Amino acid sequence: MTGTVPNRSVLTPAPQDTRHPDTEQPGPAHPDIAHPDITPWSTDPYADALRNGHGPLFLRRTDGWLLPLDVERWCGGADAADLSALRRCEGPVLDIGCGPGRLVAELAARGHRALGIDVSETAVAHTLRTGGSALRRSVFDPLPGEGRWGTVLLIDGNIGIGGDPHGLLLRTAELLAPGGLLIAETVSPDIDERVRVRLYDGRRAPGGPDRTGAGDGHFPWARIGTPALLRYAQPGGWHPVDQWVADGRPFVALRRDRRVRTVSHSADTANSTAVISSQFPRKTSGDSPLAGS
């Protein structure tokens, strides 16, 4: 079903530091947040699917249950549901788990400063080809502009990264500027599920070691509905400013109470050096910011 998009007036931008987040040396990520294994997303079969532009690709649970992943949509342009989220973005935007970059490219086309991050080299390369800017890193790695981003996106199920919504919300709070906006896509039922899954393309044997040599290839993941996300968010000082459904996809916009203090582990601004120029520079290192042409 398709829901009606609520009035955007509830998303009046809060006063923010207007400096762009790319003017600060990234500091270490929060030491209390576990860093999940990112290897499965950086190699086959995810990379194969992105190169081909289509699936099949699934998250396979240990009991054999399959969650189809919409690779074709990810590799296409931003659709109406995506645009319903992008229209709400404020200030510079960080897209966590940007995949092949459709959202970053659309934001750039609309004049937003936007950066995608993804652990997949193939995803980052695809983002660059579409005209977006991307960095090959995990959300739990040190990132440029921590505490400066106007909006953080967790779309396409990325609220499930690491299998720990509470920890991911803590990390997101570190990345956002005071009063910044988190836009997350949830799942339609009231689900609060934490599982171990592996990537599966329907062709390779679902059991045994994966092709990376990283054990059995399973990693933690979460699937949560809007009520569950709000339950996780409330103790951390987040409050909902918008909820809507577009083309059957539910979204939530959250803002964190400015009075809730986030402990920053970023380098001292006064002693930091620029890691990205006013236009994201072209780099080729897997640890460096990357920009499209």
Where do the PLM segments sit?
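Short alpha-helix
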Residues: 219-243
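A short SAM/SAH-binding and catalytic strip from SAM-dependent methyltransferases
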Residues: 149-166
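A short acidic, Gly/Pro-enriched loop at the edge of an enzyme's catalytic core
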Residues: 140-151
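Conserved SAM/SAH-binding beta-strand->alpha-helix loop
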Residues: 120
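Conserved beta-strand signature within the Rossmann-like core of class I S-adenosyl-L-methionine
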Residues: 179-187
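Conserved SAM-binding strand-loop segment of SAM-dependent methyltransferases
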Residues: 131-141
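A short glycine-rich, Lys/Arg-flanked "PGG" loop and its adjoining helix->strand segment in the class I
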Residues: 166-178
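S-adenosyl-L-methionine
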Residues: 2-24, 30-88
